[in-house]
Every structure is written in structure tokens, then in C-alpha cells.
């Protein structure tokens, strides 16, 4: 697995072993030196789990013993950084939860904050959030004022409802407003990485709580920083693709009087792995300037024959009365790791300020079958 090998491979496991051995030279490490032997065929997440368990086995005892070892390694070894931090922070959280005391919980939160700048502690903190969300959020509220931008980013990123690669925290999904005070404290942050996390966090909430997201974005636009408009656009991107009228209106894309000619497809049959070209013309037929958000939706065929919709950004435009916007776009069906294609009927539609055109169908041909008419 080249991707996993590059991030959590044999070399990283060896570096972690050396760092821990340097922190506890009197201890014989049995599990860490051979942990990488189990890496074959494992995903990145699974490799982190293997190293976490090896570290916990080699540093047995209470939470304080592990925390002291980790702090010593961090203080004395410049190589104690990068992807090895993932299993290290996982081990810290696991040992603290296992011990079950407020003192170990609070120190684990502090130690994650100390280490997050060396990679990120956003995955490990989920274990602590699941264990005691209220206590964790009280601590995280203080992080929003940290002079360290990595800690401020952790406050937002670590508490995202749908953080990629991370375990879910059920209460973050059932209580979506629980993290809004964190976002309120950070949306005007000086750090772009913090603001980007805030936008992604709010976008996560739009899956289940669109009204909360729109109301939060509206409050921010009422008390903005120079960067707030861009942050809100990113935070509302999913709602815009859904055609949510409140989100669109908040960004200035209200009802518009337009005529949409298209989409017109260049071909009705698309060879496997090729692309489809489509065109359209959007005309402002009203008496006032029209501000437009234009997307297109591809209805992909699933294995069971049903269709799933994916929306893609096309353009934003301001059209004077009578002015036209010409669309000319290609959509690729080349193989990618994030989507599996199935031959058969697909469809494509335009979406202008949330209003969709009727879908136009086309056929994605099976592999090896060419379209002789092309």
C-alpha cells in the first residue's frame, strides 16, 4: 500500500521506537520494534492502531507514566514529529479514558494540545470527546484564545461532526449547536488554516442542520472581518449545491428571471473512460441585473440501476438585462479513486440559483465498447 507506506511505514515505526527508547533507556521495548512486521496490507488507520497498541504494551502502568514518557520524547528528540504523532496521541487518549480520572482526562487534553503542532491531534481527541463531551468542550473553549494557531485549529477541526478518517462522536451529531460557540470565537481568526477549518466545520453541520448553519452564517456576516465573506461562501458550499434558497439568498443569489437554453450534449453515448461535452446559454430576460450561481448535476448510475446525484460548480456571474452567459464544459469519466462508474443511462442538468433544468440523458458505454457513431 504505497500511500500508507509513505505516511506510516517501516521508517516511521523505527523512528517512534528510537524516540520512546531514548525517553526510557532503562526499559526493554518488545512490541514497538516488531510492530511494522504487521503492516502488510493494512490501511493507514489500521497501522496507527497497531503502533498505538504496541506503545501501550511497551509503556504499561498508569496514565502518568505514559504522559511522562511522551513529554520526555517530545522534549529531547527533534525527530518526534510527523505521522508517528497519530498513534502517540491515540495512545494518550486511550490510556486516559481507561484510567477514568478527571486528572488524567484533563492532562491528556493538555498533552494533545502540546503535540498537535507536530502533526495533528484531531483524531485522538475524538476518544476524549466520546468519553466526556461536556468536560472536553469546556477545555476546548479555552483553546480558542490560545496564541498557538495549531491549538486553535484543533478546537475547530477536532470537534467537526463528520471529520474525515475520524471516529464519530454521536453527541456532536445529535447536538449540532454544541460546537457553535467554538466557531463563533474563531470565524474571524487571523490564521487561514483556522478559518478554513471553521468553514469546513460549519459545512459539516449543513448535512443535518441547514437552518442552524444559515442562521450562524447570517450572524457572522452581520459582524464580519474582511475574510468573513470568503469563509461563509466555503461554509455554505453544500447548501448552495443543494439549491437551498436561504443559503443562496445570503450569498446574494436571489430569484432571477432568466432563460436557460440547455444543457445540449455533444454526444448521446460516451465511451468508457472518456468525457462528455455540454453547452448552454443563460440569458437574463428580466429588467434588473441578475446575480447567478450556476452549477451542473451529473446523475451517476449505481450498481443497482438507481441514480445518485453529484453537483459541480460551473460559474458565478452578474448579467445585465438582456446579457447572456455561454457555458462550454467537459465532464470526464476517467477512472478516479473516489468514484466507481457503472455503464448505462446517466443524466446531466444545470442548476441556476438553485433551480434545476430537466435532466438530459446519455449512455455511458461498457468498457471495450466503442461508439462507432463518434
Residue ranges and their predicted role:
Residues 258-261, 302-316:
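Short beta-strand and strand-turn-strand segments in soluble, beta-rich domains
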Residues 355-374:
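Short beta-strand elements
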Residues 291-302:
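Short acidic, flexible loop segments centered on an aromatic residue
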Residues 309-336, 364:
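A beta-strand/beta-hairpin structural motif
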Residues 1-247, 256, 271-279, 288-291:
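Surface-facing alpha-helical segments and adjacent helix-coil boundary elements at the starts of domains
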Residues 264-271:
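Short beta-strand segments of immunoglobulin-like
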Residues 283-289, 355:
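Short solvent-exposed strand-capping/beta-turn motif centered on an Asx-Ser/Thr pair
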Residues 335-345:
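Short glycine/proline/serine/threonine-rich loop/turn segments at secondary-structure transition edges
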Amino acid at each position: 500500500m504505497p500511500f500508507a507506506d509513505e505516511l506510516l511505514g517501516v521508517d516511521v515505526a523505527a523512528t517512534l521506537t528510537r524516540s520512546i527508547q531514548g525517553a526510557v533507556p532503562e526499559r526493554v521495548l518488545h512490541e514497538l520494534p516488531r510492530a511494522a512486521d504487521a503492516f502488510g496490507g493494512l490501511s493507514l488507520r489500521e497501522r496507527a492502531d497497531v503502533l498505538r497498541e504496541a506503545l501501550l504494551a511497551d509503556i504499561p502502568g498508569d496514565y502518568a507514566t505514559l504522559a511522562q514518557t511522551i513529554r520526555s520524547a517530545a522534549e529531547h528528540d527533534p525527530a518526534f514529529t510527523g505521522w508517528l504523532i497519530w498513534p502517540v496521541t491515540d495512545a494518550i487518549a486511550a490510556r486516559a479514558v481507561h484510567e477514568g480520572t478527571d486528572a488524567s482526562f484533563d492532562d491528556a487534553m493538555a498533552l494533545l494540545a502540546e503535540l498537535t503542532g507536530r502533526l495533528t491531534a484531531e483524531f485522538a481527541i475524538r476518544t476524549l470527546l466520546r468519553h466526556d463531551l461536556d468536560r472536553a468542550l469546556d477545555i476546548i473553549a479555552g483553546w480558542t484564545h490560545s496564541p498557538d494557531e495549531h491549538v486553535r485549529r484543533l478546537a475547530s477541526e477536532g470537534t467537526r461532526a463528520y471529520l474525515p478518517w475520524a471516529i464519530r462522536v454521536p453527541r456532536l451529531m445529535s447536538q449540532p449547536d454544541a460546537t457553535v460557540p467554538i466557531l463563533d470565537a474563531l470565524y474571524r481568526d487571523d490564521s487561514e488554516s483556522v478559518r478554513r477549518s471553521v468553514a469546513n466545520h460549519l459545512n459539516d453541520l449543513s448535512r443535518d442542520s441547514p437552518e442552524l448553519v444559515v442562521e450562524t452564517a447570517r450572524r457572522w456576516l452581520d459582524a464580519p472581518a474582511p475574510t468573513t465573506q470568503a469563509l461563509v461562501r466555503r461554509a455554505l458550499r453544500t447548501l448552495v449545491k443543494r439549491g437551498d434558497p436561504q443559503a443562496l439568498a445570503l450569498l446574494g443569489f436571489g430569484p432571477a428571471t432568466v432563460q436557460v437554453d440547455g444543457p445540449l450534449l455533444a454526444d448521446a453515448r460516451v465511451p468508457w473512460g472518456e468525457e462528455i461535452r455540454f453547452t448552454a446559454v443563460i440569458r437574463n430576460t428580466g429588467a434588473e441585473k441578475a446575480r447567478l450561481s450556476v452549477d451542473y448535476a451529473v446523475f451517476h448510475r449505481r450498481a443497482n440501476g438507481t441514480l445518485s446525484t453529484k453537483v459541480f460548480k460551473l460559474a458565478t456571474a452578474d448579467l445585465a438585462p438582456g446579457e447572456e452567459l455561454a457555458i462550454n464544459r467537459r465532464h470526464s469519466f476517467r477512472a478516479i479513486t473516489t468514484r466507481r462508474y457503472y455503464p448505462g443511462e446517466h443524466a446531466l442538468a444545470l442548476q441556476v440559483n438553485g433551480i434545476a433544468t430537466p435532466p438530459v440523458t446519455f449512455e455511458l458505454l461498457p468498457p471495450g465498447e466503442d461508439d462507432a457513431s463518434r
